Amino acid sequence: MNNEYVLVINSGSSSLKFAVIDSVSGDAVLSGLGECFGLEDARMSWKYQGQKTEIAIEGNENHHKIAIGKLVGLTEELGFTDGIVAIGHRIVHGGEKFTKTVRINEEVTKEIESLSDLAPLHNPAGAIGIRAAVEAFPSLPQFAVFDTAFHQTMPKRAYTGAIAKELYTDFGVRRYGFHGTSHYFVSREAAKMINKPIEESNFISVHLGNGASVCAIKDGNSVDTSMGFTPLSGLMMGTRCGDLDPGIIEYLLKKGWSQEQVFNSLNKESGFLGVSGLTSDARGILEAMEEGHEGATLAFQVFTYRVAKYVASYLAALDSLDGIIFTGGIGENSLPIRREILSNLKILGFVEDVAGNEGARFGADGIIAKSEMLNAVAMVIPTNEEFVIAQQSVELL
């Protein structure tokens, strides 16, 4: 094989996503998932040349290590050994320490672990994945790509909370933002679509999936984003509440709720699921709405209204606007949700291109609306975070 491939690893608390990415085309030539780690039904599946294979992972512990060990044999069996030139790890939180992709060594791994207080579900798992991969692939250079890194260009006025400064200086409480790798990728692709240098381009990127966030991008740099200290703030999401009066937390604690109950509710029982009382999945919301389900209809209305509010507010962060970018599973595929968001932004002069909007789904990109008033477009750009991780890893070789 003459192609240069990067093995991209996204290690979660009970799962492990992986893909072998062509660093030039961005194509995933192999992709897979390990899931239910720590449970008896732990398993690992992968897709190669259209064929899906699934195996059980035995034992009750060290499933990350076992899964990555199996990756060694799998890549050898499929003939990727000579083609893989690096391993790229998706790491959720880099704090203020990591502003760009870095080559992994023991010091970097310990720094990632030290940031676990900021991302207790994600960073420890990311470090476990790193240690397992370093042991399994000792000869391959490995790199860490951080979800927060793209947002480190935010000005102080955007990332500073209106709280006692000691909370920032002593505890690091500030806006960090997430989905940075996705916002970075789609903004570069959007600049190509409108034939304008990214350094001169201004976008509002709208990543809508089970997790969702908006990012204001000025001259190619993030200048504000809706997620904050944690991924809980900002937009309404699948099970997360988004922006909420913090006084509600005190109120619930006084009502006898435990801290765990409160944060479980806000993280896992809110959003689409909480408002609809039905499901966290946007597709299920739309289906139920068509059948007249009041909760689903309200969830749809709250979600689309809040997205539109954030998009409109981020005009204040930009001198001009070239485009609104829709991406993520919902943003790329849900015609009704995109249409309603644009309808809520009619004051900005956006007129839907019906054929363009209907065509920009299921992996297709395209311009879906235009505003003569702003001289701007709305567009759909499918995200490819794995491609960014592969590219940035190869660039540091």
From Swiss-Prot:
It catalyses: acetate + ATP = acetyl phosphate + ADP. Mg(2+). Can also accept Mn(2+). Mg(2+) binds at residues 10, 385. ATP binds at residues 17, 207-211, 281-283, 329-333. It is found in: Cytoplasm. InterPro entries: Ac/propionate_kinase (IPR004372), Aliphatic_acid_kin_short-chain (IPR000890), Aliphatic_acid_kinase_CS (IPR023865), ATPase_NBD (IPR043129). This is Acetate kinase 2. It comes from Aliivibrio fischeri (strain ATCC 700601 / ES114) (Vibrio fischeri). The gene is ackA2.
